[in-house]
């Protein structure tokens, strides 16, 4: 395993740890999820470049498109929650509190 692959896997694991530690705010959870998607994109692109598998060249681009789509939905959810509740705490999204 090369040093670049180790760095990308470390970035993914740091984003995962950040998601587990800072899950009280919706904005920090979205940022950690975006970091995970970016590291997956880089890992997929590096793997395809190293293996010379030309049939899978579209996979990182499709992953990036889905990441942008999920980020747009997450930001729309963040705006809706902050306008409705006045805060971005994940605890305010609990439907059982009513």
From Swiss-Prot:
Domain of life: Eukaryota
UniProt keyword NADP, yes or no: no
Keywords: Electron transport, Membrane, Mitochondrion, Mitochondrion inner membrane, NAD, Respiratory chain, Translocase, Transmembrane, Transmembrane helix, Transport, Ubiquinone
Main location: mitochondrion
Bilayer disposition of the protein: Multi-pass membrane protein
Signal peptide: none
Cellular component annotations (GO), alphabetically ordered: mitochondrial inner membrane; respiratory chain complex I
Role: Core subunit of the mitochondrial membrane respiratory chain NADH dehydrogenase (Complex I) which catalyzes electron transfer from NADH through the respiratory chain, using ubiquinone as an electron acceptor. Part of the enzyme membrane arm which is embedded in the lipid bilayer and involved in proton translocation.
Oligomeric form and interacting partners: Core subunit of respiratory chain NADH dehydrogenase (Complex I) which is composed of 45 different subunits.
Protein name per the record: NADH-ubiquinone oxidoreductase chain 4L
Annotated source species: Balaenoptera musculus (Blue whale)
Gene: MT-ND4L
């Amino acid at each position: 395993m090369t040093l670049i692959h180790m760095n990308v896997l470390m970035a993914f694991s740091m984003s995962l740890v950040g998601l587990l530690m800072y899950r009280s705010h919706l904005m920090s959870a979205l940022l950690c999820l975006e970091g995970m998607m970016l590291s997956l994109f880089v890992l997929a692109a590096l793997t395809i470049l190293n293996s010379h598998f030309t049939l899978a060249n579209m996979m990182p681009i499709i992953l990036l498109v889905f990441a942008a789509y999920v980020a747009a939905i997450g930001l729309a959810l963040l705006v809706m929650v902050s306008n409705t509740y006045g805060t971005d705490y994940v605890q305010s999204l609990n439907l059982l509190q009513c």
